[in-house]
Amino acid sequence: DEHGVDPTGTYHGDSDLQLERINVYYNEATGGRYVPRAILMDLEPGTMDSVRAGPFGQLFRPDNFVFGQTGAGNNWAKGHYTEGAELIDSVLDVVRKEAESCDCLQGFQITHSLGGGTGSGMGTLLISKIREEYPDRVMLTFSVCPSPKVSDTVVEPYNATLSVHQLVENADEVMVLDNEALYDICFRTLKLTTPTYGDLNHLVCACMSGVTSCLRFPGQLNSDLRKLAVNLIPFPRLHFFMIGFAPLTSRGSQQYRALTVPELTQQQFDAKNMMCAADPRHGRYLTASCMFRGRMSTKEVDEQMLNVQNKNSSYFVEWIPNNIKSSVCDIPPKGLKMSACFIGNSTAIQEMFKRIGEQFTAMFRRKAFLHWYTGEGMDEMEFTEAESNMNDLVSEYQQYQDATAEEEGEYDEDEDDEGGDYA
């Protein structure tokens, strides 16, 4: 939509800016047809069939649909070790093919869920394989975590914990999403009575588009995935971000709000706008990044960022001064004058890991459902490792939430302990 490409891949836009960097996400095929550089993989054919039958079915390259026949049955071990491992080579072939057609490959964007078997098990397998082959490229994931109240399957805590274990090691940036938080935004802010998955996806799209807008359109203050990582990750393991988007308004109340930089700033820092089930008011921001789109002055953006930090200084750790990065892209999304996308690295994300960890422990103590995983060749040790890795992550977040600028000196010598001793 933003680039003026219709569902058959033909360009129908009205501005050269749409085409200027269209190659970031599209390959140009014969007859001026634009093909997205996307690979779709699953362990069962059903989802692919529905994509093919959907409105954008003709857009994707048929070779880039890679699927198995069996399905992972919500089993992480099947996705990561047995079924997924059989399919992964054919996926990697397609990845190589796509990577070779890039002039300057910056990184990979992966969208997957952490609750099921394929997205979590095979998704993390793909991430680790890509990591082996392209160690210096940015690995950005959009990971849909199990929601606190809504649960599709009973083994979600297992799959999610095993996945987080992998994401801590192999991903560079993880944008944490959560269906329930997305539902709440649709329900409360957008006033939709019965939100569909389409509505939820629309919110995620707005964010994905915001994160990558600077790669695709010219701007005054550019940013890319690598700059994002450099500015948002103070310690390599703490790369789980919450994302938000502004302006989100219901259809009826649009004309009551002004689209100004202060208004956008206020809305994107609003806790109700976060797309994952963690409340930033319960923690502190280590860093944050605001990506504005539209015609606005960079001076105004900088003033607002300073303003936020001065007024809410207790919500930002004091040992990282000016920890909000901002970028400005000139072209707003379709149908809006200006918009903003927010990415925050907040210690409050530990709430989510804590919650999953508690659910994990409750089941793992009784070895519930474990035979499904051991039957695929997994070892109980892996579960224990994943559990302790997640607990370490939580205590690291807690440690940096409590750390003050004065205490830094005492901690320097035992930094290597991964925050285990004084959590």
Swiss-Prot record:
Keyword entries, A-Z: Cytoplasm, Cytoskeleton, GTP-binding, Magnesium, Metal-binding, Microtubule, Nucleotide-binding
Bridged cysteine pairs (disulfide): none
UniProt binding sites for Mg(2+): E44
Named cofactor requirement(s): Mg(2+)
Superkingdom of origin organism: Eukaryota
Ranges for region Disordered: 394-423
One GO term of the biological process aspect: microtubule-based process
Cellular localization per UniProt: Cytoplasm, Cytoskeleton
Entry keyword Hydrolase: no
Keyword Membrane on entry: no
Molecular function (Gene Ontology), one example: metal ion binding
Sequence ranges of Acidic residues compositional bias: 404-423
PROSITE patterns according to UniProt: TUBULIN (PS00227)
Chief localisation class: cytoplasm
InterPro entries: Beta_tubulin (IPR002453), Tub_FtsZ_C (IPR008280), Tubulin (IPR000217), Tubulin/FtsZ-like_C (IPR037103), Tubulin/FtsZ_2-layer-sand-dom (IPR018316), Tubulin/FtsZ_GTPase_sf (IPR036525), Tubulin_C (IPR023123), Tubulin_CS (IPR017975)
Pfam families the UniProt entry points to: Tubulin, Tubulin_C
GO CC terms, sorted: cytoplasm; microtubule
Annotated GTP binding sites: E44, S113, G117, T118, G119, N179, N201
Role according to the record: Tubulin is the major constituent of microtubules, a cylinder consisting of laterally associated linear protofilaments composed of alpha- and beta-tubulin heterodimers. Microtubules grow by the addition of GTP-tubulin dimers to the microtubule end, where a stabilizing cap forms. Below the cap, tubulin dimers are in GDP-bound state, owing to GTPase activity of alpha-tubulin.
SUBUNIT field: Dimer of alpha and beta chains. A typical microtubule is a hollow water-filled tube with an outer diameter of 25 nm and an inner diameter of 15 nM. Alpha-beta heterodimers associate head-to-tail to form protofilaments running lengthwise along the microtubule wall with the beta-tubulin subunit facing the microtubule plus end conferring a structural polarity. Microtubules usually have 13 protofilaments but different protofilament numbers can be found in some organisms and specialized cells.
Entry's family note: Belongs to the tubulin family.
Name of the protein described by the UniProt record: Tubulin beta-2 chain
